[in-house]
Amino acid sequence: MSQDQEEDYSKLPLESRIVHKVWKVRLSAYEECSKSFSLSADGSDNCFELWNNQSELWKSVLTDSNVAAQEAGTAAFVAYCRFSDPSHLLKAREISVLSISEKCLTSPRAGTRENALEALMLLVEADSAAPVIESIIPSLSARSPKVIASNVAAIASLVEQFGAKVIPSKMIIPHISNLFGHADKNVRKEASRLTVNIYRWTGDPLKDLLFKDLRPVQTKELESLFAELPTEPPKQTRFLKSQQPTSEPNVETQVEEQPALENEESEPEPSDDQFDLVEEVDVLPNVDPNLETLMASSKWKDRKEALDKLLPVLSQPKIKDNDFFNLVAILTKSVSKDANIMVVINAAHCIQAMAKGLRSNFSKYASTSINALLERSKEKKANVIESLSSAMDAVLATSSLDDLAELIASFAGNKNPQIKSSCFSLFSRSFSNMTSLPSKFTVDTCAKACVPGVSDTFEPVRSAAAEALGVLMKLVGERAINQYLSPLDDIRKSKIRSFYETATVKAKAPTKKSKVKPSKQEESKVVVPSNAKAVKKSVVPSSPVVPSPRKATNKSLSMDVSKGNAFENGPLLPRPTTRPVSRGLSRGTSSSLQQKVKASTPLNSGALNETVQNLKNMELDDPAPQPAKHSRVDRYEHPKVLEDNDSTISSLESLKRENEELREQLKVEHEENISMQKQLSELKGELNTLRSARKASPIGDRKPAFMRRANTDFLELSTSPSFQRSVREFEPTRPKLYSSIDVNQRSPLASAKTNGNFTFHAELPRSPFSSRANNINPDWTKAIDLAAKLKQKITEMKQTDQRHQGLIH
C-alpha cells in the first residue's frame, strides 16, 4: 500500500484538506462541504463560518486542476449560493464569477458546466445582475474561442431566464457586433442566440442599435430568426429575491405582511366569544362522593354505570377551575389499566369533556392524561382508538406541543406498533391544527422521533411517521426538515414528499407589529377639525407637556400643521389670565409711558368679559373628554412600571448567574465522579491481582506437609512411656487429652487413643502455622487496606450522586 492510502486524511482540518496536494482529499472535502451546506438549518450555521471569513478559498476550489474535484467543487459552491446568507455571498461574488467564466464554463464535464451556470443564476438572484455581467464581459475578448463561446452562451441563458428587465442589455449590446465578426463559427452561433433572446424582450429598437454594424448577410439571417419567434411576449421564469413572492412560512424567516386595516377587521373565533359569555359551572360538588369506591369494584357494570353518571356532570360548556387531581387520577387509571373496553371508552369521554370545559385550566393535567391515553392506544378496535384519539386532541388543545413534545416522542420507541402509530398520528393532527409555529427544540424533538418510524417493519407505523414528517415539513419548511432525512433512501423521501404536497396547516407567519400597532407619534397626533376656532383634543401622551411662555400672537404667524407644534406633543390648553395686558405694559417700562398708554387706550370691560366667555364656550363646545386626570395617573404609574421592569431584569440576571454557578458545580462534580470511577476500577484490579496471587501462594502447597509432619510427631509422642504415664496420672481429672500443653503449639487435631484407634473431638485446637502464614503472606494486609479504600470510594460516589440529584431538583 502507498503512503497516501495508509494515512488517514479525515483527521486533518477542513481548511487543510481543501488545499491538499492529493486530489482525492480535496474531492472528499468538497463533498463534505456540499452535504453540510444542504443540511444546514439556516444561513448562520457553523458550516458557513470558514467560507464567510475566507471567501478567497473559492478561487482554488473552482479552478481545481482535477476535473472530478472541480465538478465536486462547483456543486459545493452551488450549495453555498443556495443556502448561505446573501450578505456573505456578495463578498465572494467577484472572485467566483471570474473563476467560473475562465475555468468552469469551458470544462469537459457536463456536470461542471451545469453547476457553473446554476451558480451564475443564483448569484444574480441574490442581489442584481449588473455585477455578474460586468465580471463576465472581460471574458468576451479572451484569446480562446471556447472561452468566448461559453460565456456568450451563459449570458444568453441569463437573458432567457431573467429577461432584459433584470439583465442590463445596455452593457451587452455594444459587444455583440464584435462577436458577429469573430472568426470562430461557434462564437457567431452563440451571438445569434444571444441577439434573439434580447430581441424577444426589447423588440425593434434592437435593430436600430445593432444592424448598422453588421453585414447584410448577418442582418438577413437575424431577420429570419426574428420572424420565427412566437407572437406572445416572453415570461420571466427566474426572479430576484426581491421579486420572489413570499412562500410557505418558515421557522426563522419569511414574515407575512398584512395591512393594518386588514388586521383590525379580523375578528376572533366565535367559539372564543361564546366561551367568554358562558357562565362557569362548579361540577365538583355534583360528582358522586363514592366514585372512587365504585371504580374499584370488581364488576365492570358498576364501573361503567359510575362513568355514565359522571359524563353528564362533566359535559358543561365552561367548568369552574377547582382541584381535579383526584378525579383525573381515577379516570387515567381506568383508561390505562381497566380490562373492559367500555369502561375505557367512557373514561376517555370524561377526560375529553373535562378538557373542553376547563380549556387552559386543564393544562396542569395534560401530561398525566396524554401518558395514560397513549399507553392504552395499544388496543386494535376502531371505536377504542377513535375515543382515545379524540380525548388526546382535546387535551393537547388545552396545552402547547412545546410542553408535551418530549412526552409524546418517548412513545415513538415503544415496542408495540399500535402505540407508535398512535404517537405519530397525534403528531400529524397537532401539526395540522397548530395556529402558531413551534420552537426549534420542538421541531428537533419531533423530527428525530419520527425519522426511525419511517423505516419500521410495520406498514401502518411507516405510513403514520411519513405523514407526520410531511405535515411538519409543510409547517416549518423543507430546509428545516431536510437535515433529518439524510439517512433515508429515495423511496421513503418520496413518500414523505407526497404527504408534504397534500398536507394542510393552519399556522401562519407572525405579522409585523409596526403595521398593526400605531406608533407613539401617531397616538399623539391631533385631528385638526374643519372649524379652526374649535380646537379638538387628542389622546394625551404618557409624558407631561411643559407649556412654553406665552408670546404675542400675530395674524401673519399662522399655524402650520406640517411643522412641529404643540399639537404633536399634547393638547394645547388655554391658559387663564386675570386681564389682557398689552405688550407695552410689561415690566421695565416707565410710569409716564404707562400713564400715556392708559390715557390713550383705556381698558374696555366689555371686551374682557367677552374674552372670558369665549374661553368658557371653547371648553363647553369641546365634545372630547378631559383627559388631564388620566395623564396624571399615567404619569405616576410610569415610574412604577419602570421599577418593576428593573427588578424583573435584575432577578432574571441573578437567576442566570445562579444557573451558571450550578452548571459549574455539576461540571466539577462530574469530573470528580469520573476520577473516582477510575480509582475504583484501579482498586478492583489490584484486588483481583491479590486474589490471584493468593491462589498461587506456596502456603497452600506447604499446608499438607505441615499436617503430615504434625500427625507423625503426635504418633511418636503417643507411643512414648512418659506420655502413657501422664495419661494414667491425669485421666480422672482431665478426660480430654491434647497433644500439646502450650496453646500456641497445639496440634491441629485433638485426639485420644481408644482400643488402638484415634477418636477426634469436636473442639479443634488452633492451627500451629497460623502465625507462620501471617509472616509468609503479608499481602493480605494490603488487600484489607484496599478493600477499605474501595468501600470508602463507593460511599463517596453515592454522596456525589445525591448531590447531583439535589442540584438538578
Curated annotation (Swiss-Prot):
Q: Per the UniProt entry, what are the Gene Ontology biological process annotations, in alphabetical order?
A: attachment of mitotic spindle microtubules to kinetochore; cell division; cytoplasmic microtubule organization; establishment or maintenance of microtubule cytoskeleton polarity; meiotic centromere clustering; microtubule nucleation by spindle pole body; microtubule polymerization; mitotic spindle assembly
Each HEAT repeat, start to end: 127-164, 167-204
Q: Where is the composition biased (Polar residues)?
A: 239-253, 597-608
- Provide this UniProt record's keywords sorted from A to Z: Cell cycle, Cell division, Centromere, Chromosome, Coiled coil, Cytoplasm, Cytoskeleton, Kinetochore, Microtubule, Mitosis, Phosphoprotein, Repeat
The yes or no answer to whether the keyword Coiled coil is present is yes
InterPro entries to which the protein is assigned, alphabetical: ARM-like (IPR011989), ARM-type_fold (IPR016024), TOG (IPR034085), XMAP215 (IPR045110), XMAP215_CLASP_TOG (IPR048491)
Q: Which residues form a coiled coil?
A: 637-697
- For bias type Basic residues, the affected ranges are 509-518
- What Pfam family is a match for this entry? XMAP215_CLASP_TOG
Name the segments for region: Disordered. 233-274, 507-608, 619-638
Q: Where is the composition biased (Acidic residues)?
A: 262-274
Q: Where in the cell is it found?
A: Cytoplasm, Cytoskeleton, Microtubule organizing center, Spindle pole body; Chromosome, Centromere, Kinetochore
Q: Which residues carry this modification: Phosphoserine?
A: S543, S548, S697, S720
Q: What's an example of a GO molecular-function annotation for this chain?
A: microtubule plus-end binding
GO CC, one annotated term: cytosol
Question: Where is the sequence biased in composition, kind Low complexity?
Answer: 526-551, 582-595
* Biological function: Required for bipolar spindle formation and proper chromosome segregation. Has a role in connecting the kinetochores and the plus end of pole to chromosome microtubules. Also required for the activation of the spindle checkpoint pathway.
Give the family per the record. Answer: Belongs to the TOG/XMAP215 family.
> How does it associate, per the subunit comment?
Interacts with alp14.
Q: What is this protein called?
A: Spindle pole body component alp14
- What organism is this sequence from? Schizosaccharomyces pombe (strain 972 / ATCC 24843) (Fission yeast)
Q: What lineage, starting at the top, does this entry show?
A: Eukaryota, Fungi, Dikarya, Ascomycota, Taphrinomycotina
